[in-house]
Amino acid sequence: MTGDRELQALLRLTAWLSPAFPIGGFAYSGGLERATADGLVIDAASLAAWIATLISHGSVWNDAVLLAESHRQQPSPAFLAEITALAEALAGSRERHQETMLLGDAFVAAARAWPDEVFERLPGKTAYPVAVGAVAGAHGIGLEKVLVAFLHAYASQAVSSGIRLGVAGQRDGVAVLAGLEEHIVEVARRAAASTLDELGSATVQADIASLRHETQTTRLFRS
């Protein structure tokens, strides 16, 4: 039965972080669209570098730390409310704030298909990494597995955005994902051992791109 529970947990994690899960993640680029327009991302190599940097030093790293702490502290409604407020404060632009909160709400709504008391502990509006961490933790899914899947889902979405923006083809996109595997594992392990003291980013160009996207006239994405 233990093996069955582990496989069931894997199925849930795969479903929750699948591109088919109805949260609307395809509508957001996290500033990548602006970075492409500004010539910061021009090909598969620069796309890979952009993704890797955000995962290890940018907003995605912060999301991973928030996810990890939410996974550990999911029994506490007060903590989940506090860490959601922290996630909102860390959003560097209006669109970034909108992205994390709308994705979080959509994730919670869809994940209710797997009933659990954790949904009663979540605040009325929940940031995306907080929602993923708390729900996965309540379902007993290992933290490192959740982080690897979460980071890979981000990378996959960013690659898909890059393909739609014309900076990489499909084969190049697959190669970018393959090349990021070791990096994702390393960052996931680091995030699993992190505390909130390790929050912080050093991706100024990405933050500026997210801000500049708000005034971009022609665009495919909401961020």
UniProtKB/Swiss-Prot annotation:
Origin: domain of life: Bacteria
GO molecular function: nickel cation binding
One Pfam family here: UreF
Keyword NAD carried by entry: no
Statement: the UniProt record of this protein carries the keyword Translocase: no
Record-linked InterPro entries: UreF, UreF_sf
GO cellular component: cytoplasm
Localization per record: Cytoplasm
Keywords in alphabetical order: Chaperone, Cytoplasm, Nickel insertion
HAMAP family in UniProt: UreF
Function text: Required for maturation of urease via the functional incorporation of the urease nickel metallocenter.
Self-association and partners: UreD, UreF and UreG form a complex that acts as a GTP-hydrolysis-dependent molecular chaperone, activating the urease apoprotein by helping to assemble the nickel containing metallocenter of UreC. The UreE protein probably delivers the nickel.
Family in the record: Belongs to the UreF family.
Alphabetized PANTHER family for the sequence: UREASE ACCESSORY PROTEIN F
Name the record gives this protein: Urease accessory protein UreF
